[in-house]
């Protein structure tokens, strides 16, 4: 950054977005491409290992370690190791990492070792909410997860069905869909007018079969255990009166933001991030339960959301133009620290 007039050349760890790419990545890609002072570079192995850039920005580095076969995975591991080596040796490439998840994924010892090495190389971290715990003195910028209003706004909406409880997204055990089904079964005994829809690809055939077995004798249940297109997702969410996300652990949830962006209230576990979200967007839009989701939580949340008088939650702090500018500021801070060979400590940089 010897010439302050030159745009920062920033390489992301993601390539060109595809149809199945996480919308967060696609919208970030668009926001960065439109941000002044940034030359936005998508990932390629050749450019990452041999090209010139000022900043490298990691998202989910574990994705780079897995190929389509065992041989491919070994090759990906070696390439990622070389990339980490380049970043570790360079005095002129800053490393930024977005903290999407708090914990490392379940993986083998070699991959976990490399992921920890990558994490230690970060000159600056971006966190998506104000409650993400990081070690004292970690240089960080809070950039709230952007909304999906523009992304889903082009899709036609469904008519909201009274009593319809919906959940969507990749169906994994930690997302608590089985517990939601059991709570729905108990709630049905008290209010036979409610209904339920589950949409999203199951992570395993065993989980899909377990859910089919659980709902086999339940009325008013729709299971769509396949990947949802944007149009299908919008139909599911807007056709529901309440979106239930009964995760066993929740920190940064794109599904919560998707539902709120489509003006549907959510029921989520009570924790610090969700309490902060409720205070931000309006508590009536973010219903919470303690412990495990149960029939009481479902029925009480339905009663509460029927009292909502506003048309939509307040997502004004989650504009993508603001996110692009905040990323640019974080990149400049990280590069200043790297060029000075001093990691910034003891202060956070506000977006």
Locations of the language-model features?
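Short acidic alpha-helix that forms the nucleotide-activated donor recognition element
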Residues: 228-240, 257, 261
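Conserved donor-binding/catalytic core segment of Leloir-type glycosyltransferases
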Residues: 157-176, 181-185, 196-197
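Acidic donor-binding loop of glycosyltransferase active sites
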Residues: 235-251, 264
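A charged, aromatic-enriched C-terminal amphipathic alpha-helix characteristic of glycosyltransferases
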Residues: 293-297, 306-345
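Glycosyltransferase donor-sugar binding loop
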Residues: 195-209, 226
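Donor nucleotide-sugar binding/catalytic pocket of nucleotide-sugar-dependent glycosyltransferases
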Residues: 119-153
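Nucleotide-activated donor-binding/catalytic signature segment of Leloir-type glycosyltransferases, i.e.
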Residues: 209-234, 281
